[in-house]
Regions:
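Short beta-strand-to-loop capping motifs
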Residues: 64, 190-192, 257-259
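Histidine/acidic-residue-rich, glycine-tolerant segments that coordinate divalent metal ions
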Residues: 60-61, 81-83, 88-99, 106, ...
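Acidic/His- and Gly-rich active-site-bordering loop/insert found
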Residues: 2-100, 105, 109-125
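Non-cysteine beta-strand/loop elements that form the S-adenosyl-L-methionine
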Residues: 73-75, 186, 343-349
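Hydrophobic face of alpha-helices
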Residues: 13, 17, 34-41, 111, ...
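Metal-dependent amide/peptide-bond hydrolase catalytic core
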Residues: 211-389
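General beta-strand structural signal in soluble alpha/beta enzymes
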Residues: 52-54, 76, 131-133, 157-161, ...
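Divalent metal-coordination and catalytic microenvironments
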Residues: 23, 62, 74, 104, ...
Length: 389
């Protein structure tokens, strides 16, 4: 594997890493990314960009305007997770119960690095590079608020990046079409009739109903969806009951459904409702079903994918184009619904021990920081390939 970090990125490597470590040490949740947004805005202003703050509540948009050519948006998310960090790195989180356990600190640092390099090449660019620094990717859909505030106005293409500890340093995961799934959630409340465990005949046992329901829901994936099209229905929580000798009158189930297509997303929801209605009628239980649409599938456009792949290949050679798919969800999908887009993964697991790396959302998550230079280089190369004159 031949990795060629761009010299102009290599020259600011210490700065990129320092920014990432500073943000890692001071993580912020959701839309409350005030310190991070201030750092971003200050650095973009120093680079002489047209900077807008308060976009999508606490997001930052920087425009590098260099002529009448196309406008390309590059996006990074800024928010952390509600996790207590247990690692022992020197830049460990100082905010109790908050941690950058998904790499968004690195995403912000990589995009700031690319912004610095590209701002120094503005006289060679024909077009506009729009840098999108987004809050609240983790579940709150910050992308929608950014879009509502006009961040995609005039944009021709959008690109998003994600560090990924399931791939080793030097690999870039990207594919045409679906790359991330729709991420929906649901709650099912089973209401039966309680009673004594020794005399169950007069009750409607919510535990028994839940057991049949959980089993039946698994047939959606195994018997209703095409086995060549990945889908998931998972029950992650069961709550209810009072004691060993009491028939439970209420059970609450919570779970998630994932699919790569809107068709399968609709199929899952429809079949869940049919199964719930049938089992409720069979056992005489009242069952409430609350299904909440999450992020839609992230679909990479063909032309944007081909451009990204070509640029990434110049940086990591045959390490580019690893056809990685994830059943995770990402609100970059909202950008990709509005304009042609491409989302890609940058491997951040140690090259010599990729299968021992700590995964995202773990309390001692960390990355191979060399991956930051790969990400910045790909962003810069992408703009050079498309807008350089």
């Amino acid at each position: 594997m031949s990795i060629k970090i761009l010299p102009q990125v290599e020259s600011i490597a210490e700065e990129i890493i320092s920014i990432r470590r500073d943000i890692h040490q001071h993580p912020e949740l959701g839309f409350e990314v005030h310190r991070t947004a201030e750092i971003v805005a200050n650095k973009l202003n120093e680079l002489g960009m047209d900077v807008q703050t308060g976009i999508g509540k606490t997001g930052v948009v920087g425009n590098l305007r260099c002529g009448a050519g196309p406008t390309i948006a590059l996006r990074a998310d800024m928010d952390a997770l509600p996790i207590q960090e247990t690692g022992d790195c020197e830049y460990k989180s100082v905010n109790d119960g908050v941690m950058h356990a998904c790499g968004h600190d690195g995403h912000t640092a990589m995009l700031l690095g690319a912004a610095k390099v590209l701002s120094g090449q503005r006289d060679q660019i024909n077009g506009t590079v729009r840098f999108l620094f987004q809050p609240a990717e983790e579940g709150e859909g910050g992308a929608r608020y950014m879009i509502e505030d006009g961040c995609l106005e005039g944009v021709d293409e959008a690109y998003g990046i994600h560090l990924w500890n399931y791939q080793k340093y030097g690999e870039v995961g990207v594919k045409e079409g679906p790359i991330l799934a729709a991420a929906d959630q649901f709650q099912i409340t089973i209401k039966g009739l309680g009673g004594h465990g020794a005399t169950p005949q007069g009750s409607v046992d919510a535990v028994v109903v839940s057991a049949h329901l959980i089993t039946a829901l698994q047939t959606i994936v195994s018997r209703n969806t095409n086995p060549l099209e990945s889908t998931v229905v998972s029950i992650g929580m069961i709550n209810g009951g009072y004691n060993f000798n009491i028939i439970a009158d209420e059970i609450v189930l919570k779970g998630t459904a994932r699919a790569y297509t809107e068709e399968n997303r609709i199929l899952i929801k429809t079949r869940m409702q049919e199964i719930i209605d049938g089992i409720g009628q069979t056992f005489g239980a009242a069952i409430e079903f609350d299904y909440r649409d999450g992020y839609p599938p992230t679909i990479n456009a063909e032309a944007a994918f081909e451009k990204l792949l070509a640029s990434a290949t110049k940086i990591v050679g045959d390490g580019a184009g690893y056809p990685y798919l994830s059943m995770g969800g990402e609100d970059f999908s909202y950008y990709a619904q509005k304009v042609p887009g491409c989302f890609f993964f940058v491997g951040s697991a140690p090259e010599d021990q990729p299968f021992r790396s700590v995964p995202q959302h773990c309390s001692h998550f960390d990355i191979d920081e060399r991956a930051l230079l790969v990400g910045s280089s790909i962003f810069v190369q992408l703009i050079e390939d498309q807008l350089m004159v």
